UniProtKB/Swiss-Prot annotation:
It comes from Mycobacterium tuberculosis (strain ATCC 25618 / H37Rv). Transmembrane segments: none annotated. Its EC number is 1.-.-.-. InterPro entries: NAD(P)-bd_dom_sf (IPR036291), SDR_fam (IPR002347). This is Uncharacterized oxidoreductase Rv0484c.
Amino acid sequence: MTTIGTRKRVAVVTGASSGIGEATARTLAAQGFHVVAVARRADRITALANQIGGTAIVADVTDDAAVEALARALSRVDVLVNNAGGAKGLQFVADADLEHWRWMWDTNVLGTLRVTRALLPKLIDSGDGLIVTVTSIAAIEVYDGGAGYTAAKHAQGALHRTLRGELLGKPVRLTEIAPGAVETEFSLVRFDGDQQRADAVYAGMTPLVAADVAEVIGFVATRPSHVNLDQIVIRPRDQASASRRATHPVR
């Protein structure tokens, strides 16, 4: 077991190698947390941890043994940010790729379950724990071509909201963050590295950036312990739903 040499509160952030996870790690570190950055890409989280004075732990949330090792490595956890996740493809149900569906389920749903279950005893023992789960507006909406992702995100949201009730009376708060369009590596992963397709997702609009979501997570993490922000939906001004958005001329 690793005892972090600080009396600071400890925040574990999954998917911390880029995007919302990286921005959240930086935000929480600036607020005084000792951040444990968790992701698969060792080079990125090691550099991040060095920059923010945190700890890097390489782990894949789809790997049972890796998540168990993560839990053993930590002597204290005050905040958990379940951020690891993603989408694959944009096929209609009739053309669904089962491997894509399996990946999305294992990463978004079972990944959140594995990490939360493994760290929950330490969050309770902290006496003032917080679980933030980054879902998506896809957890509350559906859209054509998005069934695999929306199904996974609906399930992830249901997991989180169920836990909210199951932990009543325990010293742990739970907040679901449901972002809309955020320009990160998300679309690049979804379209298997096709930069042109990824760029087209945000063309003609002003999307959120990772720091926008991280700022909200930082706000949640610094509320008094009796205040529970159950769900926060955050979209760009240009987006009303997953399928409704404003488009401006490209200058």
